[in-house]
Amino acid sequence: MARKKIALIGSGMIGGTLAHLASLKELGDIVLFDIADGIPQGKGLDIAQSGPVEGFNAKLSGASDYAAIEGADVCIVTAGVARKPGMSRDDLLGINLKVMEQVGAGIKKYAPNAFVICITNPLDAMVWALQKFSGLPKNKVVGMAGVLDSARFRLFLAEEFNVSVQDVTAFVLGGHGDTMVPLARYSTVGGVPLTDLVKMGWLTAERLEQIIQRTRDGGAEIVGLLKTGSAYYAPAASAIEMAESYLKDKKRVLPAAAHLSGQYGVDDMYVGVPTIIGAGGIERVIEIELNKEEEAAFQKSVGAVAGLCEACINIAPSLK
């Protein structure tokens, strides 16, 4: 049986980390792509040389020609410009939209059957544009945001309660930005909803709100500390979890920026929602019931994403 092929489009910090994690899990052979020739080849060689030490068998190669991604089963897109301190994800829109146009054309030509995971920011608008530029089926193009945002929420909760991260489930809806909606009612510690833990006196409603706000600011906190770029270990781990669920048909329930066509009252937009990811790509969007407050927060988030999509159309009218 031939090994699966994973194409990593963009070989910066996330791209290199993705290549290492995919190798360690032996998900398939890996092609690192970047327009900066030499970087993907160098990183590929470096990671391949860790194989004898770490005991994995995976072929790694680097390229600066899209022909190298031909026939890829999975494409993970990180190409584009990362945030610097003081920038919002939305500030990257104009530059990264042009990158998505080139990436979309490359995937359309060489890997039209791939499952595509987009990480480039501003995430929800970029994955929407990438799907349109590539023409791939909507269930095969998805954005990585919810797994990462939920992981941040889970970590902060685990630290607050001094419990294992494995016993914390967390739920984040909406766009990957300042308007994301971490849902306390659907997030649990040992199966007990956070709203019940507040009633039990484990934490105050004010403290919970602080943790929710830190989750929203999770990426900016790291950007502020690094000063020269943005997060890469946790984003890469999050995308690998999604890719693995697709490649192994695990049917994991994972939050992702998925294409909505009527669900949650949203049409032709990518927004973070709970999904089932299996061999068919996004096999199902799970619609949960929202109360008035949650619905209002979700619609505010949807509005922010819609504004970004409109800005994309102004730059590239072909997206209409």
Curated annotation (Swiss-Prot):
Stretches that traverse the bilayer: none
InterPro entries assigned to the protein according to its UniProt record, in alphabetical order: L-lactate/malate_DH, Lactate/malate_DH_C, Lactate/malate_DH_N, Lactate_DH/Glyco_Ohase_4_C, Malate_DH_type3, NAD(P)-bd_dom_sf
Class of this enzyme: oxidoreductase
GO MF terms, alphabetically ordered: L-lactate dehydrogenase activity; L-malate dehydrogenase (NAD+) activity
Entry annotation: catalytic residues: 176
GO BP: lactate metabolic process; tricarboxylic acid cycle
Signal peptide: none
Annotated EC: 1.1.1.37
Record-listed NAD(+) binding positions: 10-15, 34, 96, 119-121
Reactions listed under catalytic activity: (S)-malate + NAD(+) = oxaloacetate + NADH + H(+)
Residues that bind substrate: 83, 89, 121, 152
SUPFAM superfamilies in UniProt: LDH C-terminal domain-like, NAD(P)-binding Rossmann-fold domains
Pfam families: Ldh_1_C (PF02866), Ldh_1_N (PF00056)
Keyword entries, A-Z: NAD, Oxidoreductase, Tricarboxylic acid cycle
Keyword NAD among record annotations: yes
Family the UniProt entry places it in: Belongs to the LDH/MDH superfamily. MDH type 3 family.
Protein's job: Catalyzes the reversible oxidation of malate to oxaloacetate.
Protein name in UniProt: Malate dehydrogenase
Origin species: Agrobacterium fabrum (strain C58 / ATCC 33970)
Designated gene of the protein: mdh
